[in-house]
Amino acid sequence: MANASTTKLLTCIVALEKADINDTVTISQNAASQPAVKLGLVAGNSYNMKDLLYGMMLESFNDCAYAIAEHVGGSTEGFAKLMNEKANEIGCFGTYFITPNGLDAENDISFHHSTAGDLCVIMSYCAWKSPKSTQFLEITQTMQYTFETEEGKMVFNNHNRLLTETDYCISGKTGFTTKAGYCYVAAVEKDGRRMCLSLLGCGWPNNKNYKWADAKSLVEYAVSDAAEDSYCDAACVTTQQTGDTQTTDKQATGKETPAVKKEDKKTINLKYIENNKKNKKICKNFLKNFTINIGNFF
């Protein structure tokens, strides 16, 4: 499904791996003309790659994402190829990206999309597995970033509320389009346990805070003692709920996957949680369509 600016997780890590963070980036008219949310880059002017990365990840500036993509990939099409190659390399076969900023798009092959499960894998790679994970975390954990441009002093503020509202979030990225709804992906750590959380379609205007309430509830549950004893289907859960009915990926495909066994909990403490009736006390704010994934990735 559409995943909005959570796309920028992959944009960031591909840029960090393929380019130097101190590169100078010249802005094209295409990048400068991107829609809000935007920094207001000026076509023909030059900016530091590091500053653009902070603008993209902290403030989610769309023009920064396009400028980065064109610099690294030669064009947005070339960069999309790099993104999709990386997605396939790390096992995200339900992901196909067209735009570096996550704005809804279609081409002759497909539409811009991912899954909650794939976004957890992408976040896991960004936070822990990439050779550039340290730089990625340094960027996404920064609460405020200041730099000087030809246009004057710029100040970026981090919009990832879970960095300050929980003790366990180490990275995250928000997103929104009218098609994707409010989205959020996060990396969580507690006592050596590493987990990722992904919410897609978690509310539409005027329910911007739904994702924060649900994400906090999921994080608190995931790091709790109760989660260690959970028996959950090890399946990527994409749930569409209308009234009292639900369907899941497993039901839709007819594929069964083994449950996580208690003796495996040292390596898989919690795989996935469905937002079904017994878990309503955990996640209660979702609207008609939602997707959640929580998982451990080592």
Per-segment meaning from a language model:
Residues 1-117, 127-129:
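Active-site-adjacent loops and short helices of periplasmic peptidoglycan-processing enzymes
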Residues 92-96, 108-298:
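Domain-terminus/edge residues, biased toward the C-terminal soluble/receptor-binding domains
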